Every structure is written in structure tokens, then in C-alpha cells.
Amino acid sequence: MGIHQLMQFLKEKAPNCFRTLMLDYFAGRTIGCDASMAMYQFLIQTQSAGQTQIIELTDKDGNRTGHLVGLFNRTLQFLENGIKPVWVFDGKPPLLKSGELARRKKLKEEAQVKTELALEQGDMQQALLQHQRTTTISSVMKEDAIKMLKLMGCPVIIAPCEAEAQCAELCRAGKIYATATEDMDALTFRTPVLLRGFNTKKEPIYEIIYDDMMKELEITYEQFVDLCILCGCDYTEKIEGIGPGTAYKLIKEFKSIEGILEHVQKVNAEREKNKQNPKYTVPTKFLYQDSRELFITPLVQKGEEIQLTWNKPDVENLKKFLVEEKGFAESRIDNGLKRIAKKDTTGFQSRLENFFGKTTKIIHPNNSKAKGKANKKNEQTQKSGGKKKI
């Protein structure tokens, strides 16, 4: 979920922190990409409704491959435009997120029931919509994605915890230019630059500058974290009756959630005295202090400890994996890699050989140095028959 309605709030209250840019603007830049978020998007984008069934891209064993198609094409798109992607995967979710994960699991189960009902009724568009809501990423899918990206020569990082937090750390350390994710909580983790909107080829990309945002909001970082918690985040329930606009007004007046809670208590007491319903409802378990701590001191590997290096694609093993094991069309792999190799270098370094060094490093969450604190439908790259009907 990220931060509820934060994008719209910032458009209204801090419009000057936004820029809309086309992809080629980022030529020569290194960008940290939220791999888990991208995989969800690609899996959904490669699903379609048949006459009586939902169709998905799969390998010969029925394993979903839409995420691989998307990651392959997106990586080629980046490289072809002179962008150096660093793919960052989620590690173990924080305990505070367990409630949100349980909520999502329940919603997926409900969506599965609705999918089956819609299929029985022949409502294929509704069936597709509900099926998309059941999308999950298995450990095997994650391992396949990491294997493919390594073979393509890209740096891959497995974060100790949240991918957005690790990207923000890399960005603050100067290792990458920006964090690319749809999750707005990358700003809560203090990424200096956030990029959103890579899902379409023709539409511009939103660039959000953290310092410009804070200058317009005229609040401290700690107050911004409290604002995000009040808007609604993944780590705790929110106070009912307080939306982004009200949260901002209250933060400006009372400075912190503690001050706001005192205000809420007074307002509700006054309304109770007048035999009125409470204006605000504070959840029984309002874990704002723990949430605040998680945002301010997340579990990440220090940026200065991470060395980002690129390698030339291992074409032989990449084709063996994608063509023989995952059912991709060999011609698609060849044509994609040729596009990059032939890219003109005028104005920016975009040839494959200018990008890739000697090694690609994988940073694991159990590393002893890890310390706490598309778009149009993706072009089908698989052979005919690589689809799964539901």
C-alpha cells in the first residue's frame, strides 16, 4: 500500500517537488529499482481474459513467467536508453507488517472466490479483475528473477528487509541517482529522488525531489514521518477521521502524533459531553512509535559497504535458462541483446561494453555486514503455447 493518498496530497501541497520527464532524460544514470513491486506489475500486465478462461504466460511445467518477461523487457529498455538498473528485492518483512500482510492474504482469498464465481457466470472481465487481485510472488519466482538478472549482467541486491528502504539508503550514499518504485513510502525512508510511472512507454515519468518536497511542506523529517503514519502506512492502523489534509494541518499545529493524540482526546471528550459521536477513532493498537522507529532507522545494509558492478551478459546460459527452461523464443532474446549492442553512444554511454565490468555482486540479507538500522501489454517473448489457462 505504501502511504495512503500521499501522491495526491503532494500534488496539492508541494507541487514544485514534481517534474515530468521522458525516459531518455535518465541516460547515464544509475537507478535502484524495486524488483518486488515490478514483478507484481508485470504478472498482472501479462494476464488476459479468454472466452472462458484467464490466460497467463507460463513455462512448460505451468510455472508463471510473466514477471520474467517484464523484467527482461524493462532491463533491455533501461540499457537501451543508457540507464544502469540495480534491481533490489525485498528481504524478510518486518514484524510490524504482519497485520497488513494478513489483511492482504484475506483479500486475495476473497478475490479467488469472486474469480471462480465470475468464471461460472461467464463474466470474463470481472474474472480477470478479481484474478489479478490474487497475484502473489513465490520464492521460486523470485529465485528465477534473480537468476535471469544475474545472467543479464545487472547488479542484484537482496535487502535485509524492505527494498524501498535499501534503495533510499543507496541513494543517500550516492550509489544510485534515484529509487524507482510506485511505493510512496520510499520518501518516508528518505530517498533523495523518487521515480514513478515506468509502466508506460509514452507517458512521462514522475520525478519527486525530497528536498523540494520538504521545503514546500515546511515541516521536519520526523514530522513528515508522523504525517505518513497518520495518512496510513503498512505498519499500523490509522486514526479514523484523519485524512492527509487534516493530518498535515494537525502536524503543523501540534507538531507530533503525541500532541495530536492529546488534541483528539480533548475533542472526543467534548463531543461525548455533548452526547455526540466521537470525531476521531484511535485504533486499539496504534503502533505509531514502532512504525516511526522503523521508518527512521530501517534495517538496511549501509550504502558505503555495497559495491555496484556490472558484467557482460552471459548470453549462452541466459538463452539456456530462458529458452530451454522457461519457453522464451530464442529470436526475442537475440534481437533484444542486439538492440543494446548496436545502440549509438552519441551523447551518452549506452553500448553494452561501456556498462559492464568484471563481476556482479549479490548482497544477501544474512551478510555479516548487514546492519540494522507493460505500459502496453509486454510483448510476448515466449513461444506459442507458453500460456496457462485458469
Swiss-Prot record:
Chief location: nucleus
Statement: the UniProt record of this protein carries the keyword Hydrolase: yes
Compartments, record wording: Nucleus, Nucleolus; Nucleus, Nucleoplasm; Mitochondrion
Subunit structure of this chain's protein: Interacts with PCNA. Three molecules of FEN1 bind to one PCNA trimer with each molecule binding to one PCNA monomer. PCNA stimulates the nuclease activity without altering cleavage specificity.
Name the UniProt record assigns to this protein: Flap endonuclease 1-1
GO biological process: base-excision repair; DNA replication, removal of RNA primer
Binding-site list for Mg(2+) 2: D183, D185, D234
Enzyme Commission no: 3.1.-.-
Co-factor: note: Binds 2 magnesium ions per subunit. They probably participate in the reaction catalyzed by the enzyme. May bind an additional third magnesium ion after substrate binding.
Amino-acid positions noted as binding Mg(2+) 1 in the UniProt annotation, renumbered to this chain: D34, D90, E162, E164
Gene this chain is encoded by: FEN1-1
Class of enzymatic activity (EC top level): hydrolase
Keyword Nucleus: yes
Entry GO terms, CC: mitochondrion; nucleolus; nucleoplasm
Keyword line: DNA damage, DNA repair, DNA replication, Endonuclease, Exonuclease, Hydrolase, Magnesium, Metal-binding, Mitochondrion, Nuclease, Nucleus, Phosphoprotein
Cofactor names: Mg(2+)
Matches recorded under SMART domains: HhH2, XPGI, XPGN
Origin superkingdom: Eukaryota
PANTHER family cross-referenced by the UniProt entry: FLAP ENDONUCLEASE 1, FLAP ENDONUCLEASE FAMILY MEMBER
Single Gene Ontology MF annotation: 5'-3' exonuclease activity
InterPro entries in UniProt: 5-3_exonuclease_C_sf (IPR036279), Flap_endonuc (IPR023426), HhH2 (IPR008918), PIN-like_dom_sf (IPR029060), XPG-I_dom (IPR006086), XPG/Rad2 (IPR006084), XPG_DNA_repair_N (IPR006085)
Annotated spans, N-domain: 1-108
Region (Disordered): 359-390
Region annotation (I-domain) ranges: 126-254
Chain spans, region Interaction with PCNA: 348-356
Family: Belongs to the XPG/RAD2 endonuclease family. FEN1 subfamily.
